[in-house]
Amino acid sequence: MSCTRMIHVLDPRPLTSSVMPVDMAMRICLAHSPPLKSFLGPYNGFQRRNFVNKLKPLKPCLSVKQEAKSQSEWKSPHNQAKKRVVFADSKGLSLTAIHVFSDLPEEPAWDLQFDLLDLNDISSSLKLHEEKNLVFDFPQPSTDYLSFRDRFQKNFVCLENCSLQDRTVTGTVKVKNVSFEKKVQVRITFDTWKTYTDVDCVYMKNVYSSSDSDTFSFAIDLPRVIPTEEKIEFCISYHANGRIFWDNNEGQNYRIVHVQWKPDGVQTQVAPKDCAFQQGPPKTEIEPTVFGSPRLASGLFPEWQSWGRVENLTSYR
């Protein structure tokens, strides 16, 4: 096909005799022939679709979970500081004062002090155990010094002091210094002299030196179980110069008896089961007075001499 025929197809209008290339290009651009529009139609639709797609917003490549946002919103109220209102006085101190009140009234300090008489009753009621129901049935020999001195001069041996504590009998014995070699023993029985035991005494150095007397000590453990019908008695023997001197408490022996404690604190001797208790003549007992006195001190602590016995305070001679 020649160029002239092509131009007639695009534009049927008449052409000049001379056709320039510019004229042909202008006709092609300005021509509205149906074949060209139909040819360019699909391309225009593709451009419009591309333009619409370019206007759409792009999706982000990172996705944020909604849970993190909800948790942050849930925690945010706690992070906020709570508002507080504090009232103060003129000096800036708090107006709040706390006072604690007790339903029970406080007792004065003087009510906490023990009454000596009540304390004595309590201690007496506690002595109901078997280990505490043994006592001496004789006064301390050194309490009456005049009698002790006479017996010492006559028998050459005499029990000086004796104590019973934790089922152990301890004491001291005074002997006359008749020879250098001496032997002092305590003969004791726990079954009314069916059997007996001789316990050696130990020499003690005299605190107050005396050339005519010596002091010995002893300690005897009592059996754990002693029948109440059996008698517990002991005496002192002194061996010197081939002779034996005895101190048997003027023939009565030194006895340890079972006693029964009563709620009022009074001690009564337990009678044997096989025979009635023979009560002897009443003995002179020391009655304790309130808050202590010379009489009470001499009864509880015989080694403490009082002004009432100042006439008896002489040496062991």
UniProtKB/Swiss-Prot annotation:
Residues 141-263 are annotated as: Interaction with EPM2A. Ubiquitinated by NHLRC1/malin in a EPM2A/laforin-dependent manner. Keywords: Carbohydrate metabolism, Glycogen metabolism, Ubl conjugation. A motif (PP1-binding motif) lies at residues 84-87. It comes from the Eukaryota. PROSITE patterns: CBM21. The keyword Transmembrane does not apply. Pfam families: CBM_21. GO terms for cellular component: cytosol. Disruption phenotype: Mice display embryonic lethality when homozygous. Heterozygotes display decreased protein levels, decreased glycogen accumulation and glycogen synthase activity, reduced insulin-stimulated glycogen synthesis and progressive age-dependent glucose intolerance. When Ppp1r3c is silenced in adults, they display decreased PP1 activity and glycogen accumulation, increased phosphorylation of glycogen phosphorylase, increased GLUT1 levels, increased glucose uptake and increased glycogen degradation. Residues 149-257 form the CBM21 domain. One of its GO terms (biological process) is protein targeting. InterPro entries: CBM21_dom, CBM21_dom_sf, Pase-1_reg-su_3B/C/D_met, PP1_3C, PP1_regulatory_subunit_3. Acts as a glycogen-targeting subunit for PP1 and regulates its activity. Activates glycogen synthase, reduces glycogen phosphorylase activity and limits glycogen breakdown. Dramatically increases basal and insulin-stimulated glycogen synthesis upon overexpression in a variety of cell types. The N-terminal region is required for binding to PP1, the central region is required for binding to glycogen and the C-terminal region is required for binding to glycogen phosphorylase, glycogen synthase and phosphorylase kinase. Interacts with PPP1CC catalytic subunit of PP1 and associates with glycogen. Forms complexes with glycogen phosphorylase, glycogen synthase and phosphorylase kinase which is necessary for its regulation of PP1 activity. Also interacts with EPM2A/laforin. This is Protein phosphatase 1 regulatory subunit 3C. It comes from Mus musculus.
